[in-house]
Design a protein with these regions (language model features):
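N-terminal Rossmann-like or analogous alpha/beta NTP/dinucleotide-binding catalytic cores
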Residues: 76-142, 146-164
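Conserved beta-strand segments of alpha/beta enzyme cores
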Residues: 3, 105-108, 167-169, 291
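N-terminal catalytic cores of NTP/NDP-binding nucleotidyl/phosphoryl-transfer enzymes
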Residues: 17, 22-86, 91
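Residue-level signal for inorganic ion chemistry
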Residues: 41, 99, 138, 198, ...
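Phosphate/ribose-recognition catalytic cores of enzymes acting on nucleotide-derived substrates
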Residues: 2, 215-329
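Glycine-rich, Lys/Arg-enriched anion-binding loops that position phosphate/diphosphate groups
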Residues: 161-262
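Short acidic-hydrophobic, aromatic-tinged amphipathic segments that line or gate anion-handling sites
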Residues: 2-22, 108
């Protein structure tokens, strides 16, 4: 069973210094992959494959361990550069579902705040990896740094592992077409809605998940009722797409056309929203959790002079989406 847990560190922050509280190590042993896992690209998948192999190796020696991913919320760059936060690749909930589908046992979330940013490498290892997670093996990327001012290196981690009884495995970066696969690269391809490139870099279609919420019913008055899903601010991708929606029926996905963005024709500085018009569907599904898979980019968002002009464009978008989805059946 997949477990999502939020770690609460036993520390006090007093006058700029951490007062560390040791606690008795308890709970199951773990193999732990550390990272932001922003976008879950091929490099992240290589880390998770190494995690599985380490778990199997330890299991063969009689050491049963949970496969755990240790990640951070918010992204550390949001904490250090609040005025220039990185574009989000996946909403948090979608990332959780993707990790669950990969067969992990556990996702542990550590709140990235002033206390965590001030931890020395030694405090992080002792309190988080040893005391809290009871780690027997750690998997990180080859450029991993940790602790206050990024003062801890892989060598630091390996030296502490020798003393404290855990293994450390550094995984090399994955290359694709002579370019390092990274979250920054994913953001670049998403900003131009290059869905084939995203699939090459992650091994899967781009998808978004959430609960269907009530909207303004504007689409219904125009003849295009929609499912509405709230999206996080600063999502890296926007536009009009042909989509498949999962979670509505057991027989498979329902096809449709989706608008992802701020709807500049109907709202000024509107909230980020995913609106999906389903083909051949007339059931009410408010509150239901769905997964929307983006299959093809149709066009960028644009502001129309009036609703009738927008409606005529939506008819063209629907026709293009239907045509694409029928050809790929």
């Amino acid at each position: 069973m997949f477990n999502l847990r939020s770690l609460s560190l036993a520390t006090d922050f007093i006058e700029g210094h951490l007062r560390y509280k040791r606690k008795q190590v308890s709970g199951p042993a773990r193999v732990v992959a550390i990272g932001n896992f922003d976008g879950l690209h091929l490099g992240h998948l290589a880390l998770l494959e190494e995690l599985r192999m380490l778990q199997q190796t330890l299991a063969a020696t009689g050491q049963g361990c949970l496969q755990t991913v240790l990640s951070f919320e918010p992204h550390p760059r949001v904490f250090f550069q609040p005025n220039q936060p990185p574009l989000k690749i996946l909403p948090f909930g979608t990332k959780v579902l993707c990790l669950k589908e990969l067969g992990l046992d556990e996702l542990a979330i550590l709140k990235f705040n002033r206390s965590l940013a001030s931890m020395t490498p030694e405090e992080f290892v002792h309190q988080v990896l040893v005391d809290e997670l009871n780690a027997k093996a750690i998997v990180v990327g080859e450029d991993f740094r940790f602790g206050s001012k990024r003062s801890g290196s892989i060598e630091t981690l390996q030296q502490m592992g020798e003393r404290l009884g855990f293994q450390v495995k550094a995984v090399a970066s994955v290359m694709h077409q002579q370019e390092r696969v990274s979250s920054s690269l994913l953001r670049d391809v998403l900003q131009v809605a290059n869905l084939p490139a995203y699939k090459d870099l992650t091994g899967r279609d781009y998808e978004l998940s959430g609960r269907v919420s009530y909207g303004r019913q504007l689409g219904r008055t125009l003849g295009f009722p929609t499912l509405n899903l709230a999206m996080p601010e600063r999502l890296a991708i926007a536009g009009i797409f042909a989509v498949e929606v999962f979670g509505l029926q057991p027989s498979g996905p329902v096809r449709g056309v989706a608008s992802l963005g701020r709807r500049p024709t109907v709202e000024q500085q509107g909230r980020n929203l995913l609106e999906v018009h389903l083909f051949d569907w007339n059931q009410t599904v408010y509150g239901q959790r769905v997964c929307v898979r983006l299959k093809s980019f149709i066009r960028s968002e644009q502001k129309f002079d009036d609703l009738e002009t927008m409606r005529l464009q939506m008819l063209q978008d629907m026709a293009k989406a239907r045509d694409f989805l029928q050809k790929t059946n």
